[in-house]
């Protein structure tokens, strides 16, 4: 079994990912996507959007605007996302480290790596990979709680985040053309990884109730079991 086979199964099942904000309905700026990587921790997307609206209304629309915003005021703006005091500290930590090491957002996107991101307090592997893939357009697949749900259901026990990512990435790069045909559009590899992540999240939200998989979900995943 491979990530490629799972990707195909989710597409063939007409899994709807078009409401995934970072893809088909991409109305968010790169700054908003960057901030949302922290805001989305331990909350739902609707609450993240409320926090982003607050930031926009306060004219906090680029990373430079965070420099003169104190942590307490930032926390109030992002309050809808929950754990707002902690998240405000994480965002300020990121901002300070960013301005120590990068002189522009374009330079950041080209030069930042996973090691640097993991050195920022508040950014874990999933958050770091989210920035690399969605902001920097790197060929990095984000895996998460939802990815682990599918892997566990299929009988795959991951021992680490990186092992889970490798499992889902398997055979996708070498079957890029076939996936583009299936999706009926030309996608670069980093875009395929974005779509795959969105498919996984959408599928799990639609078909899992806790650990229980819906009857339709069973029909989609069971043929993939080894």
Spans of model-derived segments:
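Noncatalytic linker/hinge segments flanking ATPase motor cores
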Residues: 78-82, 105-109, 130-135, 170-174
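Short, well-ordered coil loops that connect the C-terminus of an alpha-helix to the N-terminus
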Residues: 16, 45, 61, 123, ...
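N-terminal polyanion-binding entry modules of DNA glycosylases/AP lyases
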Residues: 1-109, 181-226
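Short, mixed-charge aromatic SLiMs
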Residues: 57-68, 114-122, 165-178, 221-226
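Phosphate-backbone recognition surface of nucleic-acid-processing proteins
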Residues: 133-197
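Catalytic DNA-binding helix-loop module of base-excision-repair DNA glycosylases/AP lyases
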Residues: 34-40, 91, 110-159
